[in-house]
Amino acid sequence: MKLRSKAAALLLLALAALLLALLSLRAGRAEPPALPARPASAPQRHPAPVPARWPGPGALPGASPGVRRRRPPRPRPRAGRRGAARLEKLARRPGEPRSFQAVLPPELWIHLAVVACGNRLEETLVMLKSAVLFSHRKIQFHIFTEDSLKPEFDKQLRQWPDSYTKKFEHRIYPITFSVGNPQEWKKLFKPCAAQRLFLPVILKDVDSLLYVDTDVLFLRPVDDIWKLLRLFNSTQLAAMAPEHEIPKIGWYSRFARHPFYGSAGVNSGVMLMNLTRIRSTQFKNSMIPTGLAWEDMLYPLYQKYKNAITWGDQDLLNIIFYFNPECLYVFPCQWNYRPDHCMYGSNCREAEHEGVSVLHGNRGVYHDDKQPTFRALYEAIRDFPFQDNLFQSMYYPLQLKFLETVHTLCGRIPQVFLKQIEKTMKRAYEKHVIIHVGPNQMH
């Protein structure tokens, strides 16, 4: 009995010790006890001086140094913010990083204009396709065409996948000429080409515009050429590339019978315009001593030089900027790369260093065998299925096609054509991997 009572006593002592240990552990986690009050006679201790710091984000105006204020509670996100974020998520393509594109106001969109008549439907659609493949910002397409082509443009553009149609809106306009004889304008150089001269008059609500010919292809985001608008000084209102890099073998310097810009003229196949400035400028001219508004100048200018011009509206633009050189910004040839830049030997240094940014397949080179390098690029973009992998379905087949063009002068420099498109595809691929796989899972 004594042994049992001793065992019971020891068990009770052990339980009591365990209970005390638990209580002390719980008390240790609580706030420390307050310090005893300092006697009134005790000397005041001044804290060591603290280096001055900028007030933190929680500091309040008028707070004394050393006094820390509690940060105000974070406001709950408004429903509008959540709605905007939801819209942005819906508007992003798979693999596209978060940006303000989805909620970008319409006045900040890129505006792209093209004039298409006759058999230019397919060429125009391929150009528009190249624009949406790589662009980041939303684009407003302004398509000027004949009545017979309007239904087909609408039909084809609406058949594109949703992930691409959400990147643009399009509007189709009739061919119209506000001054002079419409039939004369329509027959100037190529069918409907003179329409571009009237864009500042027709698109009165558009501030800035990128005009391109139907035979143009974008090999990098349209956003990049749009940024050149920021480089305009206070007098510049349009931008174009030189017609030729070597004036002594250029067309204008050898054959032109009218004034032209600079030493070699400019090519109007890719033209960036500040329409607001164009509409508000009085242009110097050879007809009257005072300036003329853009619309008032066009028909008298055509009447004066119509027997001397060869390249139609491009010649008229050269004449305008001959008398108003301060109004033109000249961008490098990589933004308007044509067969002339390689068929006589490479003569576009910017493209050699940076690669072709905008390809201009003039003289019908997309549809014949004279320049197979240009044709290979056109067919690669035309035949690319929207939802396929860019590297597998466009870039690698393009490299194989380029192997068949090495016997041509343009085909001997494939890196000039591939540099920008490869860089653009890599950027798109890296964004896709980082967004969908995550940076910590890439190794």
Curated annotation (Swiss-Prot):
Membrane topology: Single-pass type II membrane protein
Spans within the Lumenal topological domain: 26-443
Region of interest called Disordered, as start-end residue ranges on this chain: 32-84
GO molecular function, one term: UDP-D-xylose:beta-D-glucoside alpha-1,3-D-xylosyltransferase activity
GO cellular component, as recorded: plasma membrane
GO process annotations (BP): O-glycan processing
Top-level taxonomic group: Eukaryota
Reaction(s) catalysed by this chain's protein: 3-O-(beta-D-glucosyl)-L-seryl-[EGF-like domain protein] + UDP-alpha-D-xylose = 3-O-[alpha-D-xylosyl-(1->3)-beta-D-glucosyl]-L-seryl-[EGF-like domain protein] + UDP + H(+)
Stretches with biased composition (Basic residues): 67-84
Record-linked SUPFAM superfamilies: Nucleotide-diphospho-sugar transferases (SSF53448)
Residues annotated as transmembrane: 5-25
Feature: compositional bias, Low complexity: 32-45, 55-66
Subcellular localization(s) per the UniProt record: Membrane
Keyword ATP-binding: no
UniProt-listed Enzyme Commission number(s): 2.4.2.42
Sites where a glycan is attached: N233, N274
Keyword Cell cycle: no
Residue intervals on the Cytoplasmic side: 1-4
Protein keywords: Glycoprotein, Glycosyltransferase, Membrane, Signal-anchor, Transferase, Transmembrane, Transmembrane helix
Role of this protein: Glycosyltransferase which elongates the O-linked glucose attached to EGF-like repeats in the extracellular domain of Notch proteins by catalyzing the addition of xylose.
Family to which the UniProt record says this protein belongs: Belongs to the glycosyltransferase 8 family.
Protein name: Glucoside xylosyltransferase 2
Species whose genome carries this gene: Homo sapiens (Human)
